């Protein structure tokens, strides 16, 4: 009889490790934040962006200064904070992206698709803005800025620098007027003729601006390598992109406040105008700015929250993030308007003649003021570096939100992450190519105005809030927060989620439709009819999927059920849902308890 070989029994530690591995094999590895501040920093990197630095200060001035701030704070309390907290909480609790989380309320799954479409629209053009900023940053490394003079090959006879004496300027204007034209500053000609090679017509592509093409390619490579191991592994990139812009903002703020005329700019920034509170345009601009700057409705917050551990204090992070976002906008306002006050002082013009809306504020106003600053090269490089970083970090987080939603819906993408991510980055790069043609800025304006903000965003956010508040259940969101971190919110938050937040987004959507104005060229002319029609098509892409999927669900699925039963199941009226993370925690506790008892 042969001797049998002794096989040692596995230790408790080995069993626990085996248990953990088996559970990970059942659920695909989504990746989790490992550091205490990873989630907070990722939200800062995502939500704090170009809208805070330039769009907020401009809108604040345009709409009455202090009056705009009052309205902004109202929307901040009624919509931004509640919806922000709602998205983060549900993402963490369900451990799903924007599409798959709606399996708990399938009638609203079209909302998740709408989130993905809006993110798709925004991702398509964000790297183009980054390319513009990088182009300016590179151009700033010169003793004389290329936009300072009219002696460049792209300048024509209508060019003025603003530094001519009165007699010379009058002569140039008279000469140009006699030819039926108008003068352009050297800054404007650099932007239109050198950076964009602008044809002035969205219909005339005119070829590719190859410098922007290659810079955009470099930007997409940065995005790819920041994400190829998953955003939870890109800690250094996230932290750098979240924190470094604040260094630059405070440098610009300190420098701006020490400039002559800064007080004039601050006064215009904060000047109260109570009569503007009755102006519907103020409410529309403040509301849309709140939704856009806090990044709700894109699915990215849900995705970032889904990478949290089940018991992570997402409530504290969400409230902190909302406070940081608001303070960043206000601080950036002081920095920007102190500099604009200096411009007003130097040019002896009213600020209303200096400030220009949209991308023009960043790429026309600042190059002009940088030319008159001491150590101009340093401040120009710092400013456009800040724009570049803010664009890249928002792009990375939006891409993560989109890719997480698609990975949850199609798990094979997670298995081949590097390859599939590369294909997606290449796809979006190709979509961006028309936006680096000679009419590219107009295509970007179209995507921004119709596809990624305004009507489409507000429409999707309305149904998202309704679906979460009534499908998932406002009381269940409050309960989920308590289960995860032990925080019990006041009962009143349920009424905010069920009534205030949906009403706010719906009213803003109606405002946008009622006060609709076709998109215009910078010179005030309307885009052609076909372009605005295409814009409405872009908007409809994210809107029609919501009722479209609901119709599909009610009439083409679960045919063995009655229509009433399908509605009941689609709205999850039975409240049957469970957090995968919570289930894993329970299973862990039960099986480890069994291991301990069996080993004794």
From Swiss-Prot:
It is found in: Cell membrane. It is a multi-pass membrane protein. Highly expressed in the head, the excretory canal, tail hypodermal cells, epidermis and vulval epithelial cells. Expressed in the excretory canal-associated neuron and in some non-amphidial sensory neurons in the head (at protein level). Residues 1-38, 557-600 are cytoplasmic. One of its GO terms (cellular component) is neuron projection. It comes from Caenorhabditis elegans. Residues 12-30 have a biased composition (Basic and acidic residues). Belongs to the sodium:neurotransmitter symporter (SNF) family. Disruption phenotype: Mutant worms are morphologically similar to the wild-type but exhibit mild swimming defects and are lethargic when crawling on a food-free environment with their movement being interrupted by frequent pauses. Worms paralyze in the presence of exogenous betaine. Simultaneous knockdown of snf-3 and egl-8 results in uncoordinated, hypercontracted and paralyzed animals. This is Sodium- and chloride-dependent betaine transporter. The lineage of its organism: Eukaryota, Metazoa, Ecdysozoa, Nematoda, Chromadorea. GO terms for molecular function: amino-acid betaine transmembrane transporter activity; gamma-aminobutyric acid:sodium:chloride symporter activity.
């Amino acid at each position: 009889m042969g001797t049998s070989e002794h096989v040692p029994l596995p230790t408790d530690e080995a069993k626990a490790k085996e248990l953990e591995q088996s559970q990970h094999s059942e659920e695909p590895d989504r990746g989790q934040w490992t550091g205490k501040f990873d989630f907070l920093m990722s939200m800062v990197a995502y939500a704090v962006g170009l809208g805070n630095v330039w769009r907020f200060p401009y809108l604040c001035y345009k709409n009455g200064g202090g009056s705009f701030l009052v309205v902004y704070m109202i929307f901040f309390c009624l919509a931004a904070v509640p919806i922000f907290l709602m998205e983060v909480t549900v993402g963490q609790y369900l451990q799903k992206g924007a599409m798959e989380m709606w399996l708990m309320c399938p009638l609203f799954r079209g909302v998740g698709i709408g989130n993905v479409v809006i993110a798709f629209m925004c991702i398509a053009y964000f790297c183009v803005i980054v390319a513009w900023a990088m182009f300016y940053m590179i151009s700033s490394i010169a003793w004389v800025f290329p936009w300072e003079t009219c002696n460049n090959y792209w300048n024509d006879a209508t060019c003025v620098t603003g530094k001519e004496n009165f007699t010379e300027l009058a002569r140039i204007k008279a000469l140009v007027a006699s030819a039926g034209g108008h003068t352009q500053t050297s800054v404007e000609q650099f932007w239109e003729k050198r950076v964009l090679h602008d044809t002035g017509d969205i219909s005339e592509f005119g070829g590719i601006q190859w410098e922007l093409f290659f810079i955009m390619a470099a930007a997409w490579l940065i995005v790819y390598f920041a994400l190829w191991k998953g955003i939870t592994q890109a800690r250094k990139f996230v932290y750098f992109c979240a924190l470094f812009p604040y260094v630059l903002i405070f440098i610009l703020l300190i420098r701006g406040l020490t400039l002559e005329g800064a007080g004039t700019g601050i006064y215009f920034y904060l000047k109260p105008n109570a009569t503007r509170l009755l102006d519907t345009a103020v409410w529309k601009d403040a509301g849309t700015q709140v939704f856009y700057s806090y990044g709700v409705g894109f699915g990215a917050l849900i995705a970032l929250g889904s990478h949290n551990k089940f018991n992570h204090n997402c409530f504290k992070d969400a409230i902190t993030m909302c406070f940081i976002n608001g303070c960043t906008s206000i601080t950036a306002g002081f920095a920007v308007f102190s500099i604009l006050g200096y411009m007003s002082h130097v040019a002896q013009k009213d600020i209303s003649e200096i400030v220009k809306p949209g991308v023009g504020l960043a790429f026309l106003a600042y190059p002009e003021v940088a030319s008159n600053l001491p150590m101009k090269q340093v401040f120009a490089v710092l400013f456009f570096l800040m724009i570049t970083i803010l664009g890249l970090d928002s792009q990375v987080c939006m891409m993560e939100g989109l890719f997480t939603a698609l990975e949850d819906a199609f798990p094979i993408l997670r298995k081949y992450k590097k390859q599939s991510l590369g294909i997606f980055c290449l796809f979006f790069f190709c979509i961006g190519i028309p936006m680096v043609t000679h009419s590219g800025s107009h295509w970007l304006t179209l995507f921004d105005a119709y596809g990624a903000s305004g009507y489409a965003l507000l429409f999707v956010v309305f149904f998202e809030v309704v679906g979460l508040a009534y499908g998932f259940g406002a009381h269940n969101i409050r309960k989920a927060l308590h289960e995860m971190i032990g925080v019990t919110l006041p009962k009143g938050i349920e009424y905010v989620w069920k009534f205030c937040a949906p009403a706010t987004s719906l009213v803003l959507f109606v405002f946008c439709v009622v006060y609709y104005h076709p998109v215009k060229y910078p010179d005030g002319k309307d885009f052609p009819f076909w372009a605005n029609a295409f814009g409405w098509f872009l908007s409809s892409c994210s809107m029609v999927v919501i009722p479209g999927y609901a119709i599909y669900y009610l009439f083409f699925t679960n045919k063995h059920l009655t229509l009433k039963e399908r509605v009941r199941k689609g709205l999850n009226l039975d409240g049957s849902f469970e957090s995968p993370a919570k289930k894993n925690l329970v299973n862990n506790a039960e099986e480890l308890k069994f291991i301990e008892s069996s080993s004794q």
